[in-house]
Regions:
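Generic C-terminus detector
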Residues: 232-254
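Short, surface-exposed charged micro-motifs
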Residues: 186, 214-216
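Short, hydrophobic/aromatic-rich segments at coil-to-beta transitions
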Residues: 199-205
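Solvent-exposed loop/turn segments at secondary-structure junctions
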Residues: 42-43, 231-233
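Short, small/polar residue-rich loop motifs at catalytic or cofactor-binding pockets
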Residues: 209-211
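Short, well-ordered beta-strand elements
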Residues: 215, 222-231
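Short, surface-exposed loop or secondary-structure junction motifs
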Residues: 1-199
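Extracellular/periplasmic catalytic domains that process cell-envelope and extracellular macromolecules
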Residues: 30, 217-219
Length: 254
């Protein structure tokens, strides 16, 4: 942000190409592979897809993902504000309603830094399509997507690509979920359940979003779980998703 780069959850005043030109000129935070940090890498991949296919990213999403999976309520912006949940954020005094330009510090265990929020971006059809953080949807659609990944990609992905989702690619510096976790191409990957002190089994893939959602799928247990809240950051990395996780496994174990 010090060089004016914009992310997928803040007010967008540039095109994707303009934003990535700024990114290309920004100095590296560290040498590649030295440490984990958030980036616009997935936005870059979205731009690569546009160049390779000659199609805009929203059209790619519809043709490659939404239509095959039957996702009817997920897009890069919401056409109707009435369909959006009101976003809140945690404070010591209880949840407070978000406002434009709100800055929140990320938890230290998530590499620190801060998030600049723009709830109005979800209604801005002119905002650039952010592959990393720029979409809205509902629980049914997210669950369909997560379940498709758990079951092997449902013909959207090649078997070797699916295998990359389930392989750790970064060392201990990327243990954003704590000990026992690695990082695959799809998010945090559980490597050692005992070290992580979780009922989930090795191979579980999980991630979340700063507005307050979390998801995971456990291939061994044949479980896909989606937790959507409207509260940052509790719904992403607070006690609530941990309690839901534990309740799900307690019910499964009977």
């Amino acid at each position: 942000h010090q060089v004016g780069i914009q992310g997928g959850v803040e007010l967008s005043t540039r095109t994707l190409e303009q934003n990535l030109r700024l990114l290309a000129r920004a100095p590296l935070l560290s040498a590649p592979g030295e440490r984990f940090n958030y980036s616009l890498a997935i936005d870059v991949l979205g731009a690569v897809l546009e160049r390779v296919t000659g199609m805009p990213l929203p059209q790619l999403f519809v043709e490659w993902v939404a239509r095959p999976l039957g996702l009817g309520n997920t897009a890069f912006y919401a056409a109707d504000a009435a369909n959006l949940a009101t976003p809140y954020y945690n404070t010591p005094q209880g949840p407070q309603r978000m406002h434009e330009g709100l800055r929140l510090a990320l938890p230290e265990e998530m590499a620190g830094g801060e998030v600049l929020f723009s709830p109005a971006r979800a209604l801005n059809a002119g905002a650039y399509p952010s592959g990393g953080a720029g979409m809205v949807g509902d629980a049914d659609d997210v669950l369909r997507l997560v379940e498709a990944l758990r079951s092997g990609g449902q013909d959207m992905l090649r078997p070797d690509t699916v295998a990359l989702l389930h392989s750790p690619h970064v060392g201990a510096q990327a243990q954003t979920q704590g000990p026992g976790w690695g990082f695959g191409f799809g998010g945090a990957l559980l490597v050692d359940a005992d070290a992580a002190q979780t009922p989930q089994q090795a191979g579980t893939l999980t991630w979340g979003g700063v507005y307050g959602h979390s998801w995971f799928f456990d291939p061994q247990a044949q479980l896909s779980v989606v937790i959507l809240t409207n509260t940052a950051f509790e719904g992403m990395c607070g006690r609530y998703p941990q309690q839901i996780r534990d309740a799900v496994y307690a019910a499964e174990m009977g």
